[in-house]
Each structure stands twice: as C-alpha cells, then as structure tokens.
C-alpha cells in the first residue's frame, strides 16, 4: 500500500484514536499505528487485506444467486409432492470465507446492511460454506436461466439446478 506522508500521519492518528476509544482492541491499534508510522512495507500489506474489489458483474452474480435460491425455495414450497427432496438440500451454503471472502463480504452487506434476503442468513457458519462455491453457483445459474419459468420450477428442474 503506497501512501504519502500526510496520509500516513492521518491514518496513524486514526489508529491512535481508535486505540483510545476501543480499549479491548487497543493493542491491535497500537501495532497498526506503529506499522503506519514506520512505513513497514511488508506489514502495510496487512492493511490491504481488509479491502476488496468486487466488480459490478460479481455483485450481480451474487444477487442472481440469491434470487435463484429464492426461486428454488418458492417453487419447492408450491409443489404438492415434496418427497423427492429435503428442505435442507435447498439451504443456501454461502461462500468460502478463505477463498471467496469478497463474495461473502458482499453477501453480508446485502443481508446485514441493506436488509435484503434475510432468510439466507440462516445458513450455517455465518454463511461460510468452508469450501469454494462460486463455480458451483455459476453452473446452477446456467441451468436456472435455461428454465422457461424461473419461479415455477418442477421438482425435476429444481433437482437439475441443485445437481449442476
């Protein structure tokens, strides 16, 4: 992370203030203040880890995935015979907190800050799937988009989407 001296001074002061305001995390903020003041390039990279770039396309894909799960659950609830599939199978897994952190952060923003798709935050482990899910969701979206009635899916269509 490259910063001017002025930016470093401002950030160091912010960390100093945060340490005074948040005594439980004071040691963490003192460390970060020392890193910024010292201009330690290796440790400054830590500051970048909190920032991610999620493109408009990626944001839309996350939203499309949530819509797809909404359609899956709505369609399932409207079926008269649900015996071929358990409701647990329709549960949204989320994204991997290690490998897909930026998608998980966007999901948490959409559900927590924006208040949308609240029903999906009932997923296990805070929606940390603990395995990468992006590619799986992309395959599922392809199958879902090929269905003629996106919100009136048959049991076979639901199973095809889940098995993609």
Swiss-Prot record:
Entry-linked Pfam families: YfbU
Domain of life: Bacteria
Xref: InterPro entries: UPF0304_YfbU, YfbU_alpha-helical_sf, YfbU_helix-hairpin_sf
Family: Belongs to the UPF0304 family.
HAMAP family named in the record: UPF0304
Listed name of the protein: UPF0304 protein PM1500
Organism from which the protein derives: Pasteurella multocida (strain Pm70)
Source taxonomy: Bacteria, Pseudomonadati, Pseudomonadota, Gammaproteobacteria, Pasteurellales
């Amino acid at each position: 992370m490259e910063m001017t001296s002025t930016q470093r001074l401002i950030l160091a002061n912010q960390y100093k203030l945060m340490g005074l305001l948040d005594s439980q995390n004071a040691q963490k903020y003192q460390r970060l203040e020392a890193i910024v003041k010292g201009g330690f390039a290796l440790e400054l990279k830590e500051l970048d880890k909190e920032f991610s770039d999620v493109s408009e396309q990626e944001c839309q894909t996350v939203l499309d995935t949530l819509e797809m799960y909404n359609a899956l659950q709505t369609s399932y609830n409207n079926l008269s015979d649900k015996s071929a599939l358990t409701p647990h199978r329709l549960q949204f897994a989320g994204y991997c907190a290690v490998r897909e952190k930026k998608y998980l952060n966007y999901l948490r923003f959409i559900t927590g800050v924006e208040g949308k798709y609240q029903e999906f935050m009932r997923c296990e482990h805070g929606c940390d799937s603990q395995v990468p899910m992006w590619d799986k969701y992309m395959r599922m979206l392809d199958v879902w988009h090929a269905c003629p009635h996106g919100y009136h899916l048959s049991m076979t269509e639901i199973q095809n989407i889940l098995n993609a």
